[in-house]
Amino acid sequence: MKKVNLLLAAVVAASVSAPALAEYTPNAHFYGFARAGVSSQHYNVDDPEKARLGRLGYESDIYGEVGLGTTVAKVDDSEWNINSRVAYKSTLNKDWQTADNTNSTEHANFAFRELYFDVKGFFDSDKDAVIWAGKRYYHREDIYINDWRYYDISGMGTGIENLSLGSGKLSLAWIRRDENRDYKWDETSKVVLEDDEKLDKTYSGYGAVHFLDAQYDFPVWDKASMELRATYMINQHDNAKFLQYGYVAKNEVGNGTRFEVKLNQGFSSGWNTTAVIFDFGSHTGSAGFGTGSWCDSSGAANSAHGISLFNYGDFKITDRFGIMHSIYFARSGGYDDNVNGENFIGKVLADEENKGVTANSGYKAFMFAIHPYYQLTKMTKLVLEGSFYTETWSKVGKKDGVVKNFDENQKGQKLTLAYVLSPDASNIWSKPEIRLFATYLHSNENGIDFSNGFGAKEATIVYKNGYEREATKNHNNVIFGVYGEAWW
């Protein structure tokens, strides 16, 4: 009881003294995002390829974010704020799911996504500038209908936003993401390493990635703005572990660089965004439906390069009819594919009968999604979403001393019809939304085409719960269900 009384006294003292400093009574605000529902999709599907095929009628999880924030103080023209956010994710339709990690197939996941502090109006000469520090979502760029954040370097960091420079605004940030490198990738998944396996010098790893980001936004003409952005990614390894496991300079993971040019154009009946992204170095894998933050820890992408093109938008053709769309093209190359080289880093094929070593030498992808919608009544509408994607990995393989080139390809198509209820059916952004949908899918089995490689025409898919079945080249499925989504 004594400890409780001391804590209460401290809280009371703080609450009494704070207004004296700032002459301001804090106000709290509550915000978030949520989606949940039910569908006939196979319950073991963890994370469908929404970036490739679109979110409508292709969601199989429960996901929510809850945020709390407040303006703690106001001094002259400055505002001092604190913001926080936690997220929840569940993949199975169980009534009771704990956060216990002992059973990875049934537990729910919680994550602390944001906790940061900011002050706006600190500079007398630039009242729009914001100084911030903490962990936060940082300038995420996304395509809504694909539920894909193609530029997302969120994490722990600090920075200054919206500095006035010429006709535009400049934002600078340093963000850090830590990585646990006690694992490696096999052909299909992440594998935790035992101590003796860590001596495998082909997986050197790193301890953290530091992102140095600069973004400049400025108007170019009527209803149009340009964004120029550059991110330099510095990979930092744990020196103790690096030396402990005998890694040397050739095992180092190189740094990466990303450049973006983006044009946002508004119209009286909608908007359109076109973006071009150039990737260089160890983060080039982000050119394949990535976020810009992933690093190839094998070191095979140290000399790689890639380009990604995006176009997406929303157009109202009539008062009741509109179309959203997204187009994506990517290509990358320059990977270390010298399977005969001393420093070569490759993968062992999962199929024991056709065991060999493979390496990526190139990659290309294309995606197109169209999302027309028609308002029926004030609070209902019909939505149709069609999408297509294809990906090809150019590879070099070595087996029994023989080197050969081959391609691995995966592709898919989706068509969804949905009846949607929302507060304002004329507004595509109106939430909450309840969607009754039916979806047809045609894709590679489990996202993998087993007809390529070293003649492995069939393979066995092993789910997280141990369930096994044979995989085939093509996969057709019809999914129906009801999902809700909201943000506030």
Question: What feature does the model see in each segment?
Answer:
Residues 2-4, 8-127, 131, 161-170, ...:
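Beta-barrel outer-membrane channel/assembly domains of diderm bacteria
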Residues 26, 54, 58-64, 108-113, ...:
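Residues that define the transmembrane beta-barrel architecture of outer-membrane proteins
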Residues 32-40, 82-88, 131-137, 172-176, ...:
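Transmembrane beta-barrel strands of outer-membrane/channel proteins
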Residues 39-125, 137-150, 183-185, 193-203, ...:
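Surface-exposed loop and membrane-interface regions of Gram-negative outer-membrane beta-barrel proteins
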Residues 67-69, 116-118, 159-161, 211-217, ...:
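Outer-membrane beta-barrel architecture
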Residues 121, 185-196, 376, 391-416, ...:
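Outer-membrane beta-barrel transmembrane domain signature
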Residues 147-262:
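Aromatic- and glycine-enriched pocket-lining scaffold segments that form the walls
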Residues 219-417, 421:
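Detector for outer-membrane/organellar transmembrane beta-barrel domains
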